[in-house]
Amino acid sequence: ADVKKITETVIGFFEPKKGKCPAGDEYTFLLNVTSNAAGGLEHANSTALAAPRKWLPCTHDKKRTDNYVQLLTLFAHEYFHTWLVKRIKPAAFIDADFSEEAYTSLLWLFEGFTSYYESMLVRRAGLIDDEVLGKLLSKDLKAVVETPAHMAQSLSQASFDAWIKFYKPSANSVNAHVSYYRQGALAAWVLDAEIRRKTKSLSLIHISEP
């Protein structure tokens, strides 16, 4: 039921008039339960997810636990990619040759904005409250500020260098490379706040509306 609420909310975000997913009536979530690993990989009509067993809900839980909320945001993140990345994508990803790297300086937008909305849309679906949303955003802020590299590398550089740095971490990564996921999410948060401040009535979420 919770995942259904998420999919309906994401569809409403991108398709307020049509009310349908571009993948059609069938979309498959493949969840692999692990000991510790977590992540996801989006496809045009499905997504492959990995989540620790502790993220799964228990029948005796009286409320959604922090671990379960992480699972919900993972579902939201990968489903959001059905539009942003699979349908709306950087030029380098169009007709890309998957046997080699595809470089782009825009990963911070595609992954960062998705990371921001994974929390915002779970909140919009009514699955968390404002307090929990604030904790999720603050967690990203804390992680970025405490990473020395956030003052040494731009988001566009972090995106372009992903193949040689982000995906090949070293002992010096904390000093040399930022997460375009988390720092990109903060960029979306700041942009959203600035739009709200200046317009008094609009927000970043209005980009989904005609």
Region locations from a protein language model:
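Surface-exposed helix-capping loop/turn segments at secondary-structure junctions
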Residues: G12-A23, K89-A91, R123-D130, I195-L202
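Feature representing long, continuous alpha-helical segments
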Residues: L74, K135, R182-W189, A193
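Short glycine/serine- and small hydrophobic-enriched flexible loop segments
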Residues: Y116-R123, L186-R197
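Residue-level detector of conserved catalytic or cofactor/ligand-binding positions
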Residues: L202-P210
